[in-house]
């Protein structure tokens, strides 16, 4: 069995690229400002931001949440039920991987063999999520997609990007941007397949929901996100028994397990903060929820609050062409 050593480090300065000033963790008098204090201040500020859908006349009032931007969308029609800064450019972190894996599922068969180059393995940031694959080893595409969606493995994302582009993982960015445009995205620019920090890699709550409409329509990908354990058996292509637990708390057995969940993907970097894109279905209505620049565990709580708001206040009805009114 392969054991993993995951490095962790604390960033002393967070550079805000999108109009937010640099936050320093040292007070001028020499006292340290705690991360908890900064987190609480971020939450309080985000909760004070306007929810644009609440300004619509006779629209059900949506919940106050701690995400900087968020959206609740009907998956089938694209109707927006809740809107909070939905076109604001945000860093997606690992929620990027729903686009990467969607493209892979559309372009590749699950039994294709993916080679791991030196660059794919070593271009990831220290301490970022990985499964400790070595250069020269191979996995099937199905194993790769499971590793990406269950473990959020960054080196696997690079390898899949190289496999699809036929060259370098950097060239995969053009493929991502082309597909995002086809899906209706209007605020995004992608430069890597895993969401590792880059000022030129951004999206919005609206765009993630649009990508989510295609991603969550794929039953195989949804099933992967809901799988409790990543288990890759040793083979002639790689020698180790790889096992990793899915840490997603919305899935069955999680602390915030949501009974109507269809699938989900989290993301986190110091700048992006906590992001989450998810889908739930109840009584024939399928909703997609995106929360961005949130905090942990608030992003779980906010997601549940938004799903509950949607299922409690809206329903889909079929209206005959001969009818002019429909009473609910």
Regions from the language model: what does each represent?
Residues 16, 25, 97, 247-251:
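An N-terminal domain-start capping segment
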Residues 33-206, 210-219, 282:
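Active-site-adjacent loops and short helices of periplasmic peptidoglycan-processing enzymes
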Residues 10, 17, 67, 125, ...:
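Hydrophobic alpha-helical segments and their boundary regions
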Residues 1-69, 317-328:
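N-terminal secretory targeting signals
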Residues 17, 88, 146, 251-252, ...:
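A short, sequence-level motif marking secondary-structure junctions
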Residues 185-186, 197-202, 206-328:
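Domain-terminus/edge residues, biased toward the C-terminal soluble/receptor-binding domains
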